[in-house]
Structures are given as structure tokens and as C-alpha cells.
Amino acid sequence: MKSILGFFMLLCLVFGTVYTKEQVRITMKQYQLVNGLTVILHEDHSAPIASVMVMYHVGSKNEKPKRTGFAHLFEHMMFQGSKNYNDDYFKPLQEAGANINGSTTPDRTNYYEVVPSNFLELALFMEADRMGGLLDAMTQEKLDNQRDVVKNERRQRYDNQPYGTAFEKISELMYPKTHPYNWTTIGSLEDLSAASMDDVKAFFRQYYSPSNASLVIAGDFDSKQAKEWVTKYFGGLTNGAPITRPSQPQPVLSQEIRMNYEDSVQLPRVYMVWQSVPQGNKDEAALDVVDQF
């Protein structure tokens, strides 16, 4: 009994220490270039690495019906070379030991590099060059190549994957055809096939501009030096035409909706979906936790 009581008291002591621990505070500096690019700097010298992320405020919600999949297709095109480095984007950074990737959601597209801190300038140069000079190196061959890659990705992850089209059907059920959340980021095979070079160039000119992007640098670097590099590589980039944001109201579901569909799977699956709150809402974090249960 004494040993059990002692163990219980030890647990109380340990967990009490954890919960009274001081909160981690992340300091940052935020400013904006003349061309509208938002820059966020966070120094952390605990390891000799630096992370660069560029987030463009464009996603599949900015697409139009019959032109779906453009935002995700552009994620692929951004790794195909640009004005001053017309080659595989991964090559020089991976030779420096970098970790590189990008992702697309309905609301944003982001690209990042985690590099040894002495290669931070290289990462900034590469990001700035494709922000300002992607169209200078874009060709029909590159577009056709990446279009086929994205089509294969759709077949692999959606069409030929068990339950792969479930969320497409859910999106169509939750949102009307005119709403930008009606379709998924991958787009349809028909829309991807219909994408022309002019369509792709127009999408880039409209959304891939400094004033529609945020640049974040975090890790082992000197802020003064980083600011000089940011001005050097991003400061001279220009913006396109003003951006019109989608303004579709959130559809209200007045009653429960049910749907049954057959798929080539061995076991049935049930999906239960609720409309949630917008990003930044005070209840967002709590609902994210509930979602895990």
C-alpha cells in the first residue's frame, strides 16, 4: 500500500511539474516590402539549420468551374526551373542537404526548404527566382509533362484507391456547384486535359505575385543579413493586376443529408461530416482536438 501511495505521489509531482512549466514563447519580426511581400523572421540558434517557406494566398478555391486543378498543377510547375536557373529545382538544394517540398489546399499553396544555415541565401535566391521568373522558363513540354504527372497522381490517390473518391462526393454534397469548395484540389481529368498554356500563364500572373505571398524565415540566421538578402532577391519583383477574392457565402445545411454509393471495396465505410467554423475562430483549436476522437 505504501509503495502504491508513493507511486501516486510521484505521478502527481511529475505531472504537476509538467503543467506548471513556463509556456514556450516564440519571438518574431514582421515587416512588408514596398511590393507588398509580407516577411516574417524568427531566429532560433539551437541547431545550424534554417527554414524558408513561401505561402501564396491561392488555392483550389480560386479556380473556376471547368478549370479545376490549376492550383495543384502549379505546385508541380514551380519545381521545373525558372529564369536564372532553368533546371530541376531540387538539384542544387538537395546537393546542399536540403529538405524541400510544397503542398496545396483549398485556401493556400506553400513551398519550403530546410537547409544548413550557410545555404540560406541559396534558398532565398531560388524562391525569388521562381516567384519572378517562372514564366520565362515555362514551355509546352514542361506543362504536358507535369499535367501527366498530376493525372497519374489522381488515378493513384483517388480513382484507383479504395474509398479514394469519398471526399469528392462529400464536397459535392456539402457545397453547390458554384461554390469553390465543391471540388477537390486535384481537379478532374477533363479539366486538367483542357488546361492550355495561356490558361496557366494567366493563373500565374494573377496569383503568384509578391503582394499575394508571405515569406517566413526561421532558424539559425542573422536578421540583419536576412533582411539584406530578402531585399536583394525579392525587392525588385513586381505585382500583377489586383486580385479578386471569391466571396461565396457559407451554405447553410437546414437538415441532415444522407448519401449511399457503391464502390469496388471489400468493406463498407461510414463518413460523418459537419460544417465547422472559419479559420481563426476561437473554437477552431477545440474542434480540431474533438476531430481526433
Question: Can you say where each PLM-predicted feature lies in the sequence?
Answer:
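Non-catalytic, conformational "gating/processing" segments within enzyme and secreted inhibitor domains
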Residues: Q140, R147, K201-Y233
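Solvent-exposed, non-transmembrane alpha-helical starts
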Residues: P65, E121-L124, N160, E228, ...
